[in-house]
């Protein structure tokens, strides 16, 4: 099973969009929203089909908190503004069987603006050439490996 972990903080305006997207996914998965102390109506807007865990503020800390609660053997960290293709989870078991312990998705921005398209191209090129990944691209990692490496750094920026 895949555990989708989403760190959130004051996301009331966009939280419904990702929940609707998550409901379209195929495969066996759980969703864990790791809240860093939202003060708006984010938590009220989370569907009861999804789990919420409470964490100190900080994306790395929130990701670690979600991972500790995860039931899956694969962790999939995404940001709350990411939209996933409905069959994305079906591809993960084959990659794990081939020995890939971690990975990411190709990023595509929902914008026709040239700068956003360049940003997406450069992000994907960075992954291909340098093996540097950000959670905007979705971070996939076997739970055992995540625990062995001690989780995400607990720093305010660039933890992922």
Regions found by a protein language model. Name each.
Residues 75:
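Short aromatic/hydrophobic "clamp" motif used to bind/position activated sugar donors
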Residues 35-43, 82-83:
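A conserved acidic beta->alpha catalytic loop
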Residues 1-3, 30:
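Cell-envelope/extracellular polymer assembly enzymes that use nucleotide-activated donors
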Residues 54-70:
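Glycine-rich, basic loop-to-helix element that forms the pyrophosphate-binding segment
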Residues 157-160:
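Acidic donor-binding loop at a coil-to-helix junction in glycosyltransferase catalytic cores
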Residues 71-72, 136-149:
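Conserved nucleotide-sugar donor-binding
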Residues 5, 10-24:
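Short, well-formed alpha-helical segments that are part of the catalytic scaffolds
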